[in-house]
Amino acid sequence: MARYIFITGGVVSSLGKGLASAALGALLQARGYKVRLRKLDPYLNLDPGTMSPYQHGEVFVTDDGAETDLDLGHYERFTGRPATKADNITTGRIYQDILTKERRGDYLGATIQVVPHVTNAIKDFVLSGNDEYDFVLVEIGGTVGDIEGLPFFEAIRQLGNELPRHHAIYIHLTLLPYIPSAGELKTKPTQHSVKELRSIGIQPDILLCRTDREIPKEERRKLGLFCNVRESAVIEARDVDNIYAVPEAYHAAGLDDEVLAAFGIEPRIPPALASWHTINERVRNPEGDVTIAIVGKYTGMKDAYKSLIEALSHGGIANKVRVKLDWIESEVFENEDPAPFLEHVNGILVPGGFGQRGAEGKIRAAQFARERDVPYFGICFGMQMAVIEAARNLVGITEANSTEFGPTKEPLVGLMTEWLRGNELEKRSQSGDLGGTMRLGAYPATLKRGSRVSEVYGGATEISERHRHRYEVNTAYKDRLEQHGLKFSGLSPDGVLPEIVEYEDHPWFIGVQFHPELKSRPFEPHPLFASFIQAAMVQSRLV
């Protein structure tokens, strides 16, 4: 039977519960255990698919087409286990399911209440599908004390009593702020956070304390005394120089040993952390630097590009170089010459996005890369803008544009109205809902034999990648674009949807309709990112 680890947060938000959960999952996995990670999000949205990147950050898409929290990206990158739609749920989804059942009459006229109906639905979700796992780590979004989180805290409190003894523990992630004027770490915020947690019936077994310095023994003793935990269970989670150092740091602090002790388990083998050590050695001792310009729409909120940042880092790890990022708001290029901003970079990446704002700036970035032979990587929207640039400046279709921005005489990019998912036909219309209506999840693509992208994938002609888009490049323009050098080197298996474009006579210019960053791992860098960084190294004359 699976054992459950519930991870909560206190004092402030954005402490890194998702990263802490992922790192602990990696440590348990390194000890030979089978691990599953799940996320409970208290917000009322059905999913984050329609939420602003500035509020929520990245939407992480799974193979089965779920739009989920970015923490699931951490889970995948640290454990290598693909997440599914069954690993993330929101209050909105729970309420939708309950109200659907109520309308059907499933509750036989009962009064629907938070307790027991909402809490039971949460418990059913947490306990479902875990037979093959040794440990299930469940992260509760938000911080203790949030009104919207109360049903989730009540549900995990009940589970602590309902599961067999030694089958559930609670880890509370908290902050120990350092006050320079006092010259000491302050424990009072953590004491109050734990007091709040205990007031709703949850006694943490382990305190995971975020700090920028060593926790003095006296402060550990005080935390143990006033928070009612063993002193050994006060774990120092000190800041590290890169996120892939977290598993080793947590192991050195004794987190995994303390978790096993809380379950009454004698450690059977030490964790196999050699691969994590190798990654950190490469991160800390690079053989050179490359600079990549990210020309995006949401550069003020780096979390909007979380998987992208990590995938570029993985490309650097694969090539033993440090990847420096130069963030450029794409709107700047609508009024400024791109050259002063881009002449010093070794590669240009134009990521996904939605809407007209900043689109012309992305088109100009693609033009600069094409004309100056700078490696260019266009992802989703970035591929579409590269195609529009080619149509305007190579083919001479001056009015080339996307119907996403409004009516146009030359729709190089248009709304997808139907496509195949397996054997089922998906259909969409211009007037349809925004939420959950995109082409989402893993889809196959057929690569042109002998193309650059086929070589990048090791000679493969069939691949599967994750998508999140509503618009597509119009194949009616395919022949004219190819006559001017822009090759369609990847298509959907039925030949209807363009998946990849490239210039054969360019050092490295590839646009993809999918999101390869979602499948990159530190141990297995995505081949497109590894190849892109390698091309940037050539550009920088490192090789």
From Swiss-Prot:
Swiss-Prot/TrEMBL GO biological process terms: 'de novo' CTP biosynthetic process; pyrimidine nucleobase biosynthetic process
Binding residues for UTP: 13, 186-191, 222
Keywords: ATP-binding, Glutamine amidotransferase, Ligase, Magnesium, Metal-binding, Nucleotide-binding, Pyrimidine biosynthesis
Annotated binding of L-glutamine, by residue: 54, 353, 381-384, 404, 470
Mechanisms controlling activity: Allosterically activated by GTP, when glutamine is the substrate; GTP has no effect on the reaction when ammonia is the substrate. The allosteric effector GTP functions by stabilizing the protein conformation that binds the tetrahedral intermediate(s) formed during glutamine hydrolysis. Inhibited by the product CTP, via allosteric rather than competitive inhibition.
Region (Amidoligase domain): 1-265
Catalytic activity, as annotated: UTP + L-glutamine + ATP + H2O = CTP + L-glutamate + ADP + phosphate + 2 H(+); L-glutamine + H2O = L-glutamate + NH4(+); UTP + NH4(+) + ATP = CTP + ADP + phosphate + 2 H(+)
Recorded metabolic or biological pathway in which this protein acts: Pyrimidine metabolism; CTP biosynthesis via de novo pathway; CTP from UDP: step 2/2
GO cellular component: cytosol
This enzyme's EC code(s): 6.3.4.2
Record-annotated active site: 380 (nucleophile), 515, 517
Gene3D superfamilies associated with the record: 3.40.50.880, P-loop containing nucleotide triphosphate hydrolases
Binding site for Mg(2+): 71, 139
Note: CTPSs have evolved a hybrid strategy for distinguishing between UTP and CTP. The overlapping regions of the product feedback inhibitory and substrate sites recognize a common feature in both compounds, the triphosphate moiety. To differentiate isosteric substrate and product pyrimidine rings, an additional pocket far from the expected kinase/ligase catalytic site, specifically recognizes the cytosine and ribose portions of the product inhibitor.
Quaternary structure annotation from Swiss-Prot or TrEMBL: Homotetramer.
Family per record: Belongs to the CTP synthase family.
Physiological role: Catalyzes the ATP-dependent amination of UTP to CTP with either L-glutamine or ammonia as the source of nitrogen. Regulates intracellular CTP levels through interactions with the four ribonucleotide triphosphates.
Name of the protein this chain belongs to: CTP synthase
Source organism of the structure: Bradyrhizobium sp. (strain ORS 278)
Organism lineage string: Bacteria, Pseudomonadati, Pseudomonadota, Alphaproteobacteria, Hyphomicrobiales
